[in-house]
Amino acid sequence: MMTPTIPVALFDRLLVEGISPHELVRRKLMCLFNSCAVPGGETLPPLLTRGMPEWHEVNVGDKRVLNWFCRELRAAILRYEPSINMLKVSVKDAHHQTLALSLEAMLQDESEPLRLEIAYSNGRWR
């Protein structure tokens, strides 16, 4: 006999009353963006490897490299946030010290997408 399971996203909603699912995911993603991935973390358990891939060493002038970074970023976000069903990540602007991204995510049980415009500036994602 199978035991019923409760989705992780439901626990988030129960713990934080009065906050919309979009706002909750936005907050969680901002925490993720301001954490760093462990280098060589492929051999560690997923719980220990959460964090954003480093972009400072990325050649922001090469579109192929930026596309690769967006794929890495998308994979990190999907590992971190199970309530996201669909995610599109794109670069809006890239320079030596700044990187602006656009995220569009469809959340479970939500009809409207979550849209985020975030940028790295002065050592922090905002």
From Swiss-Prot:
One of its GO terms (cellular component) is cytoplasm. It is found in: Cytoplasm. One of its GO terms (molecular function) is anti-sigma factor antagonist activity. Keywords: Cytoplasm, Stress response. InterPro entries: Anti-adapt_IraD, IraD/Gp25-like. Inhibits RpoS proteolysis by regulating RssB activity, thereby increasing the stability of the sigma stress factor RpoS during oxidative stress. Its effect on RpoS stability is due to its interaction with RssB, which probably blocks the interaction of RssB with RpoS, and the consequent delivery of the RssB-RpoS complex to the ClpXP protein degradation pathway. Belongs to the GpW/Gp25 family. IraD subfamily. This is Anti-adapter protein IraD.
